[in-house]
Amino acid sequence: MKLSTPDISDKYPEAKALKPILKNLGGRQSFFGPIETLKCPDDNSFVKEQLNSSGDGKILVVDANGIDTVALLGDMIAEAGVKNGWSGIVINGYIRDLDIIGTLDIGVQALGTMPVRSEKKNQGEVGVDISFGGITFKSGD
């Protein structure tokens, strides 16, 4: 039996829902799995590193503080996520290469699109608690 998000919300009233700030931008409209968290406001070095590692059906949840001056995900990094078995990517920030990412078999949710790539400063924090959209995300949830 397939459950929709409203069905899950009805069945588990204690479950919290993210405020409707993100858009579905990937080729897979629904996805699930344990999460890995990442905080990196304007540098996608760690996004690339994580998606180039084995995903085993996980979801990468990235807090970019909603920064709208650069994109943290492009087609090549998203393709690495598909190749390495990630179920999805959720970004409190922006992506680029929508025409390609929208065809990939991976869930992608983000605030929108921005064509400018991020700098590569190798900055970020993996596995830390992050909060956005009224939800706190913890690695392993």
Q: What are the roles of these predicted feature ranges?
A:
Residues 1-138:
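Feature captures the catalytic cores and cofactor-binding loops of soluble hydro-lyases/lyases
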